[in-house]
Regions:
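Tandem CBS (Cystathionine beta-synthase) repeat/Bateman regulatory domains
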Residues: 1-196
Length: 196
């Protein structure tokens, strides 16, 4: 094939235009299930951990989480030790309303300690494991677990564990542009589809 076999493209100009928008290089920031899990990891080395006191009123906790554009917070004791976690989706859930009613308490009277997930029940994974995993591994784990978050721990130079960050199902959904439905035990099925 010779170059003269290709027809020339008719060119034009931006007439009467002083400025114009351009396509930014967002393609390099696209994430896929095969992308590194670190792309959606909420690393406390890069982002401050959001903490709430165990005795804080639930309404104030919700406000603090929303005002900080988060969906998850660490619950701390008076001694600044992490005693649990709390997620926005649970604060807003019907399950919380039913739990309050069944205990004879108004939801507005609940404090963080009443509804937090105790630290001993939190799903955790070592940073050394997740640093080589893919987003798909984390997403599959989250949609098939009881909770929407996974706390990631690391070890300091003395070999002591500390909370390094977390993975969040709502955050991953937003970053990937996915509609993901959490597994409910009675259904036993998860649904993952790409919203286009």
């Amino acid at each position: 094939v010779d170059l003269k076999d290709f027809k020339q493209i008719e060119l034009s100009h931006f007439t009467d235009t002083k400025s114009i928008n351009y396509l930014r290089d967002d393609a390099s920031h696209l994430l896929y299930l095969e992308s590194s899990a670190l792309e959606v990891f909420r690393d406390y080395k890069d982002h401050d951990a959001l903490t709430v006191r165990a005795d804080l009123n639930i309404k104030d906790v919700k406000t603090k989480i929303i005002d900080n554009h988060k969906d998850f917070a660490l619950v701390i004791s008076a001694e600044d030790k992490v005693v649990g976690t709390i997620a926005l989706h649970y604060i807003e859930s019907q399950a919380l309303q039913e739990r309050a009613r069944s205990s004879g308490t108004k939801p507005a009277d609940l404090v963080t300690h009443d509804i937090m997930l105790p630290i001993a029940k939190v799903n955790t994974v070592s940073y050394s494991i997740i640093k080589n995993t893919k987003i798909g591994h984390i997403l599959n784990t989250l949609i098939n677990s009881d909770y929407h978050h996974i706390v990631v721990y690391d070890k300091n130079e003395n070999g002591e564990k500390y909370i390094r960050g977390y993975f969040s199902l709502p955050y991953i959904r937003r970053k990937l542009g996915l509609d993901v439905y959490h597994v409910y035990q009675k259904e036993g099925v998860s649904n993952l589809n790409k919203g286009i």
